[in-house]
C-alpha cells in the first residue's frame, strides 16, 4: 500500500484551511520599524540636555546686558533655549576665546520679564535661537522678553514627560496582539490550543494498491459516515475507533485519508506527540479541544498518527500516576468512551508499536478493531509498482511482475522509492525512457545504498571477495530448494564489499527445519570458500554479517522453535517489536547449565553447517571457479548466467572475453581440485574434532552436576 506522488497532493491544497497570518510578515516588520523610530525620537527629544553648571539669574542678566550693550563682537550668546520640561533656560555664552554653557532656573522676577534692550546696542547677540518660541531677533528695535517668554504649562510638561512610557507600553501591546492573531486567542502563550490540522482530502480507495482485505475491512465505515441513521435504526453499533498497526511505510496514514475521502467528511490529522507538552494539563486540554471541534463538524474523522507517543501502558514511565502523558491518555480514554452513541465521529489511529499500547485503549467501546496493515505480497507489490509508474515512460522490456519478485519484504514506501530512484537515474543518464538496468540499480540503491565504484580495492582483495560471493552462490544453488540466486555482485555498497541476492520462488510464511539448516549453510558458504582457497588462517572479516545472521537463526532454532536435541521447549521469550523487528530485551527462563547446553547446540548447528558448506563447495569446485571468473570479468552476474554456469559448467558466450589466461585457468580446474583435496580433508577433521569436543564437554558438565 502506498501514497500517490506529491504533485497530486499539492493540487488538493486548496481544500485545506488557510494558514493564519504570521507575526513577522513584511507589513508587520514595517510597522515595527516605524514605531521603533518614533520611540527613539521621543526618548531623545525629551531627554534632558546637559548644559553645564547652574548660574544665578543675576549672573545671566549681567551676561545678557554685556552682550547687548558692549560694542564687542567677541562677546555674544550662541544659543538660548527654554526647557519646557524642567522650566529653565539652557545658555551657551561666548566671551572671546572662552565658551561656557550653563542653565538658569526660570525666573519669576518682574525685572526680567519687563527687561528691554535697545536694538541699536544689540551687537553680536546672535539670537537666532534666543527666540524661546523660535522667534528670530532682527537686531532692530526693542526686544521685550516678556513677549517671548511664556510660562510653562506644568500639566502639559508632565504629560509630555510620560509620552515615552505610553509609547513603550503601546509597542508591547501591539506585539502581543500580533502574536495573538498568529497563535490564536492567547497571544504567544496558548499551550492548550487544538493542534490538529483540518483538511478535506480527495484521496480514494482507487488511489491505493494492495492490501485488499484491509480496504474491505474499512470500507463499511465509509457507508456509516455517509448514512449513520441507517445503522442507528437497525440497532447496530459501528466501531468508535479503528487502530491501524503494521510496519513503517505500509500506508496506514494513506488508508485513513482514503476513508475520509470516500466519505467526503472533514479529516482532523494530529500526531500523538502534539499532545505531550512541558506544562501539566496541556495535553488533556488539547484532547478536549480536538473532540469538541470535531463534534461540531460531525460526521468527521479524527486521525492520531504515532499513537504510541501518548497511548503507552500506564505505570511504565517515570512520574507514576502524575505523569503528564498519563493524564493525556486518561482524557483520551474518557473522550472516546464518552462520545454520544453513533454521533458520526470516528477515531482512527496508527502505530508501529501495538505491543506497548495501554489495554484500556484496545477494549470494545474505544478502539474496537485492530487492523494489521502488513507488508505487501508479490501480487500487491506488482500493483503498487504499476500504480506509481503511471505517467512515466518505461521500457517495454521491464516486467513489473519480475520486479515484484525481486523485492520481497519491501513496503509500499520503499517500492515508491524504487520507482523514483529509477526516474532520477533516467534523468541523470539522459535517457528518454526508464530502462531495466536503471530499475535494477534502483533496487540495489534502496536495499544497500549507492555503489562505491570509486573505492580503491586491490586485485587480491577483489579476488577474495569474488571467491566469497561465489561460495554463497554455489551452496545456495545446490542446497536451497525453492530459492533462486537472483544476482551476485562484487561492487561495494554501504559497508559490504559485495552481496548475493537470493529470493524464494514462492513466498512462504513458515520455514521447516531443513530449510533453516540450508539457509545457515548458505550463509557459511562464503567463509567456507575462503577456507578452501586461502586456508583457515587466512579467512577475512567479510563473513561478519553472515555469521551474525547464521547465529541468530541457530539460536532461535534452539531457544524458541524447539529444533534441537534440547526438545520443544521455549527457553527465551522474544520481546522484540513485532513490526520493527528489534530485540530490546530477552527474558532468560533457564539455568546456567541449560545456558551451556544452548551454547553447545548453537555451536553444533553452526559447525555442522560450515562442514556441509565445505563439502558442497568441494564437490562443485569447478562451478566456484567459473562464477569467480565471471564476477571478476563483469562485476555483476544475474540469474540466467548463474543457471547457465551451473548447468553447462562454462561461462556464457555473450559474457566471455577472449583472454588466454582465463581459458587456461578454467582448463586447469582439475589440477586445482587435486591440490586442495588434502587441505579440505584437514579442515573436515578439525571441524569433526570441534564437534566431538563440544559433546564431550557436555558429558563432562553433566557428570559434574550429578556428582
UniProtKB/Swiss-Prot annotation:
Q: Which NCBIfam families match?
A: FtsH_fam
Q: Which UniProt keywords apply?
A: ATP-binding, Cell membrane, Hydrolase, Membrane, Metal-binding, Metalloprotease, Nucleotide-binding, Protease, Transmembrane, Transmembrane helix, Zinc
Binding-site residues for ATP, renumbered to this chain: 246-253
An example Pfam family from this entry, by short name, is Peptidase_M41
UniProt topological domain (Extracellular) ranges: 47-128
Q: What is this protein called?
A: ATP-dependent zinc metalloprotease FtsH
Q: Membrane-spanning regions, if any?
A: 26-46, 129-149
Q: What class of enzyme is it?
A: hydrolase
Q: How does it sit in the membrane?
A: Multi-pass membrane protein
Q: Where in the cell is it found?
A: Cell membrane
What is annotated as the active site?
469
Amino acid at each position: 500500500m502506498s501514497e500517490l506522488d506529491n504533485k497530486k497532493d499539492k493540487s488538493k491544497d486548496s481544500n485545506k484551511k488557510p494558514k493564519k497570518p504570521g507575526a513577522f510578515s513584511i507589513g508587520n516588520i514595517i510597522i515595527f520599524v516605524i514605531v521603533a523610530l518614533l520611540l527613539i525620537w521621543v526618548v531623545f527629544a525629551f531627554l534632558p540636555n546637559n548644559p553645564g553648571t547652574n548660574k544665578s539669574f543675576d549672573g545671566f542678566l549681567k551676561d545678557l546686558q554685556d552682550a547687548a550693550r558692549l560694542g564687542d563682537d567677541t562677546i555674544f550668546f550662541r544659543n538660548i533655549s527654554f526647557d519646557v520640561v524642567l522650566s529653565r533656560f539652557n545658555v551657551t555664552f561666548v566671551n572671546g576665546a572662552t565658551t561656557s554653557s550653563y542653565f538658569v532656573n526660570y525666573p519669576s522676577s518682574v525685572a526680567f520679564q519687563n527687561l528691554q534692550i535697545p536694538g541699536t546696542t544689540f551687537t553680536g547677540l546672535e539670537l537666532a535661537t534666543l527666540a524661546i518660541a523660535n522667534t528670530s531677533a532682527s537686531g532692530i528695535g526693542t526686544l521685550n522678553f516678556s513677549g517671548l517668554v511664556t510660562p510653562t504649562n506644568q500639566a502639559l510638561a508632565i504629560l509630555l514627560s510620560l509620552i515615552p512610557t505610553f509609547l513603550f507600553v503601546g509597542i508591547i501591546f501591539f506585539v502581543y496582539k500580533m502574536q495573538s492573531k498568529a497563535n490564536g486567542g492567547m497571544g504567544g502563550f496558548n499551550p492548550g490550543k487544538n493542534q490538529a490540522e483540518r483538511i478535506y482530502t480527495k484521496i480514494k480507495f482507487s488511489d491505493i494498491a494492495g492490501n485488499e482485505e484491509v480496504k474491505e475491512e474499512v470500507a463499511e465505515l465509509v457507508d456509516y459516515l455517509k448514512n449513520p441513521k441507517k445503522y442507528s435504526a437497525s440497532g447496530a453499533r459501528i466501531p468508535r475507533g479503528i487502530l491501524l498497526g503494521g510496519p513503517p511505510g505500509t500506508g496506514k496514514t494513506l488508508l485513513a485519508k482514503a476513508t475520509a475521502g470516500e466519505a467526503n467528511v472533514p479529516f482532523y490529522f494530529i500526531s500523538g506527540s502534539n499532545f505531550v507538552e512541558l506544562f501539566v494539563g496541556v495535553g488533556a486540554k488539547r484532547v478536549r479541544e480536538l473532540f469538541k471541534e470535531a463534534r461540531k463538524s460531525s460526521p468527521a474523522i479524527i486521525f492520531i498518527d504515532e499513537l504510541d507517543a501518548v497511548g503507552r501502558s500506564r505505570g511504565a514511565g517515570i512520574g507514576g500516576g502524575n505523569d503528564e502523558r498519563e493524564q493525556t491518555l486518561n482524557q483520551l480514554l474518557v473522550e472516546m468512551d464518552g462520545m454520544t452513541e453513533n454521533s458520526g465521529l470516528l477515531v482512527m489511529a496508527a502505530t508501529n508499536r501495538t505491543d506497548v499500547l495501554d489495554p484500556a485503549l484496545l477494549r470494545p467501546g474505544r478502539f474496537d478493531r485492530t487492523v494489521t496493515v502488513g507488508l505487501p505480497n508479490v501480487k500487491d507489490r506488482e500493483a503498487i509498482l504499476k500504480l506509481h509508474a503511471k505517467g512515466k515512460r518505461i521500457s517495454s522490456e521491464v516486467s513489473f511482475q519480475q520486479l515484484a519478485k525481486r523485492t520481497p519484504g519491501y513496503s509500499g514506501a520503499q517500492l515508491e522509492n524504487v520507482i523514483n530512484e529509477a526516474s532520477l537515474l533516467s534523468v541523470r543518464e539522459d535517457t528518454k525512457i526508464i530502462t531495466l538496468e536503471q530499475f535494477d540499480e534502483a533496487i540495489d540503491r534502496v536495499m544497500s545504498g549507492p555503489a562505491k565504484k570509486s573505492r580503491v580495492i586491490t586485485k587480491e582483495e577483489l579476488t577474495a571477495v569474488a571467491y566469497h560471493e561465489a561460495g554463497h552462490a554455489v551452496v545456495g544453488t545446490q542446497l536451497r530448494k525453492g530459492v533462486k540466486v537472483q544476482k551476485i555482485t562484487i561492487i561495494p555498497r554501504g559497508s559490504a564489499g559485495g552481496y548475493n541476492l537470493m529470493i524464494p520462488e514462492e513466498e512462504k510464511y513458515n520455514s521447516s527445519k531443513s530449510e533453516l539448516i540450508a539457509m545457515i549453510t548458505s550463509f557459511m558458504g562464503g567463509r567456507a570458500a575462503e577456507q578452501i582457497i586461502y586456508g583457515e588462517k587466512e579467512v577475512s572479516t567479510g563473513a561478519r554479517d553472515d555469521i551474525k545472521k547464521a547465529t541468530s537463526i541457530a539460536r532461535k532454532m534452539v531457544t524458541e522453535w524447539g529444533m534441537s536435541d534440547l526438545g520443544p521447549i521455549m527457553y527465551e521469550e522474544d520481546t522484540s517489536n513485532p513490526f520493527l523487528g528489534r530485540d530490546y530485551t530477552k527474558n532468560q527462563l533457564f539455568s546456567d547449565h541449560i545456558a551451556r547446553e544452548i551454547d553447545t547446540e548453537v555451536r553444533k548447528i553452526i559447525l555442522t553447517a560450515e562442514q556441509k558448506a565445505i563439502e558442497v563447495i568441494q564437490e562443485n569446485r569447478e562451478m566456484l571457479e567459473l562464477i569467480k571468473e565471471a564476477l571478476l570479468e563483469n562485476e555483476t552476474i544475474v540469474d540466467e548466467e548463474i543457471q547457465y554456469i551451473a548447468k553447462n559448467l562454462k561461462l556464457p558466450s555473450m559474457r566471455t572475453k577472449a583472454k588466454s589466461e582465463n581459458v587456461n585457468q578454467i582448463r586447469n580446474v582439475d589440477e586445482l581440485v587435486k591440490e586442495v583435496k588434502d587441505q579440505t580433508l584437514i579442515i573436515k577433521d578439525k571441524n569433526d574434532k570441534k564437534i566431538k569436543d563440544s559433546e564431550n564437554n557436555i558429558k563432562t558438565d553433566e557428570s559434574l552436576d550429578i556428582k
